[in-house]
Design a protein with these regions (language model features):
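Active-site loop of short-chain dehydrogenase/reductase
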Residues: 5, 55-56, 83-84, 98, ...
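Conserved glycine-rich cofactor-binding loop
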Residues: 13-14
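Conserved glycine-rich Rossmann-like NAD(P)H-binding loop of the short-chain dehydrogenase/reductase
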Residues: 28-44
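Rossmann-fold cofactor-recognition segment
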Residues: 50-68
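Substrate-binding pocket helix/loop in short-chain dehydrogenase/reductase
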Residues: 98-99, 103-111
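Catalytic loop of short-chain dehydrogenase/reductase
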Residues: 136-161, 167, 171-175, 189
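C-terminal helical subdomain
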Residues: 175-187, 202-244
Length: 244
């Protein structure tokens, strides 16, 4: 009975994050989507949609880079809503700057959003899940998790770091019954940003040539549902026509 547990989705944006939130809510979880406080209205819209469809949801405005904010968020969910069984770390932090135009401020902020915030999230999740020797901690990666593209020094280095955090946690927490996995999203996703910025890429949607958020969410649920004798710790997702 998943309704006895909560699922936290950090970075519950309009596409993938929302789809993952809805997916876990559809299976009965009390979902707790989180975004930056300035996006609380969008979170409320997401929660209302889930509630209207018969699920349970409460949105939280959280700065995932702030240690106290993350600690308080996890404590509230664990103690006032339901034991935390699933945590998905899904913030986007993608920026493009030639190396000479990459300021120290940009580099640090991207690292804070993609790597440091992931560490804080994983650590707090582990604290609560270890008490029960169960749970899933999932990190969303990208093409940049695997290779540093030209102009992506800040983003790639941060995503490399997040992948390392995930690998380390998987090895440490697996024997404790906690499933840690890293999802490499290798391709464009069906989002408003892609539609507006890369219309030629978005046109591939007619041929299933860009990743669909609901299909991504299906995979997260599948990995969460795996038997512990055959866990996946890293996988990559891309459209069938994507070159790799």
């Amino acid at each position: 009975d998943f309704s006895k547990y909560s699922a936290i989705i950090i970075g519950a944006g309009d596409a993938t994050g929302s789809a993952i939130t809805k997916k876990f809510a559809s299976h009965g979880y009390k979902v707790c989507p989180a975004r930056r406080p300035r996006n609380i209205d969008k979170l409320n819209e997401l929660s209302n949609e889930i509630i209207e469809s018969g699920g349970w949801s409460k949105g939280f405005g959280v700065d995932a880079r702030d240690e106290d904010s993350i600690k308080d968020f996890f404590a509230e969910v664990e103690n006032e809503i339901a034991p935390i069984d699933v945590v998905v770390f899904n913030p986007g932090a993608n920026v493009f700057f030639p190396i000479e135009e990459t300021t120290s401020r940009v580099f640090k902020k991207v690292w804070e959003m993609a790597a440091f915030a992931g560490f804080l999230t994983g650590r707090e999740a582990a604290k609560y899940m270890k008490k029960r020797n169960e749970g899933s901690i999932f990190f969303t990666g990208a093409t940049a998790s695997m290779r540093g593209g030209s102009g992506f020094s800040a983003f790639s280095s941060a995503k490399f770091a997040l992948r390392a955090v995930s690998q380390s946690m998987a090895r440490e927490l697996g024997p404790e019954g906690i499933h840690v996995a890293h999802f490499v999203i290798d391709g464009a996703i069906d989002t408003a940003f892609i539609k507006e910025t890369f219309p030629e890429t978005y046109a591939l949607k007619e041929k299933d040539g860009i990743l669909q958020p609901d299909a991504i969410a299906d995979t997260y649920w599948y990995v969460h549902s795996q038997h512990r004798s055959a866990w996946t710790h890293e996988l990559d997702l891309r459209p069938y026509m994507e070159k790799f």
